[in-house]
Amino acid sequence: LMTHRNPSVIVMDFIPNVSASMLNERIERFMSIIEDKIPGVQILFIEHVPFPLAEFNLKKGEWVEESNEALRKAFRELKKKGYQNLHYLKSEHLLGEDGESTVDGEHFTDLGFDRFAKGIYPVVKKLIRHAER
């Protein structure tokens, strides 16, 4: 579906919905399809936001960190393989630290969506400008 459009930027915020093994299994094939169908498109990878209840749910906190590490590793490997238009955004400051950005430590509230959007906006804007050159 994405390859039927002509986007300037693709924002990849999928980490909350995949495991590290799923990421490793599928990312290179996905990237080759995007590169083939939409050459030159800017791609922004975004980490899973920190899990605010990690101190109480160690398993979930570890899963988030493992997923983010898998994304960082995949990003580095894709860059080494020659994918040029890749960008990476750490998520540690996107939601703030007051605990008001999620309903349950994971799913965003209206405030969480607002903070997330405001956090990624400058990066996406810069990538759109870069793509328009």
Feature names for model-found ranges:
Residues 40, 89-92, 102, 121-126:
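Extended, charge-rich intrinsically disordered regulatory tails
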Residues 52-55, 95-99:
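Short acidic/His/Gly/Ser-rich catalytic and metal-binding motifs that mark active-site loops
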Residues 104-133:
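Histidine-centered active-site loop/cap adjacent to the catalytic His
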Residues 1-42, 48-55:
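Oxyanion-hole/transition-state-stabilizing segment in secreted/luminal serine hydrolases
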Residues 35-39, 76, 125, 129:
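Sec-exported extracytoplasmic/periplasmic mature domains
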Residues 13-22, 58-66, 103-111:
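The substrate-binding groove and active-site-proximal loops of carbohydrate-active enzymes
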Residues 51-90, 115:
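Substrate-gating cap/lid alpha-helix
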Residues 23, 27, 71, 113:
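Aromatic/hydrophobic pocket-lining residues that form the small-molecule binding cavity
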